């Protein structure tokens, strides 16, 4: 079986003038090489295709693959993560991880909240701020937390994201609207402990494999700077047994409500009463073997990188009914 790899190589974009923040979600070459090596160890023939532009060029040149391992995040628009899966769907080429609808919804944190809340998953009270007029309508209980509605990797989150007054809300909401050209999601702040949970599989076969607790220095928010320099700013701690079942239940319910497939992460945090609430879902979780959250938490529970990739691939192969 021939497996293609699609990805956004960070250096490719940096060479073309994009900033470190613009490319925060993109991959290093060693991530791609590690994936490639893991797939080859499974006996697959592989090809490193590249980003959506390079995929289009390859398809136009007549290239095809039996399966594509897709980790492209995209750069433009609120459907940027959906571009590669949509292209592959048109060519009837199966791929690893979720399709365009799920990726599009999951990138929008407000739409995701609506779906998981309707499925009975606890969420913190919140609202969407799309204009200056919406700021005046906010009647949530302070402190609040604010972030761009459709960014990942902590982009748009900083030490000012925790809000204690209407004046702070106005300042940060106006900054997000101007800086990111998208609405802001405002939620009542969850003061409890924060966890990220790994989920592997699809549908009834999906399992929450385990998680880890995230502690940031001085209790500051988990920003893009902290994620880039997590060894300096953060502590990753194996999830205590007393929180494990509740966190895993929330994560699995979120995954199934959204229709996630093959693998990803779900972030949860405790409210003031200790109840675990949904924060975010990542159906395109980072897969750097050393520095990405899903491989880190997997190692904590005894799942090495090779085994993790094999679990993800088994899910995709079964889901697409492929014959090896």
Give names to the regions the model predicted.
Residues 1-95, 101, 105-107, 130-136, ...:
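ATP-binding N-terminal substructure of ATP-dependent carboxylate-amine bond-forming enzymes
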Residues 166-249, 270-277:
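Phosphate-binding site of ATP-dependent enzymes
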Residues 46, 94-95, 123, 144, ...:
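Hydrophobic beta-strand scaffold residues
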Residues 1-5, 61-62, 104-185, 191, ...:
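Active-site nucleotide/adenylate-binding loops and adjacent lid/helix of ATP-dependent enzymes
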Residues 19-24, 158-163, 295-297:
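Short glycine-enriched, charge-decorated loop/helix-capping segments at active-site entrances
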Residues 213-264, 293-324:
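Active-site "cap" helix and flanking loop/linker of ATP-utilizing ligase/carboxylase catalytic domains
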Residues 188, 198-199, 255-290, 298:
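Conserved metal-phosphate-binding beta-hairpin within the catalytic cores
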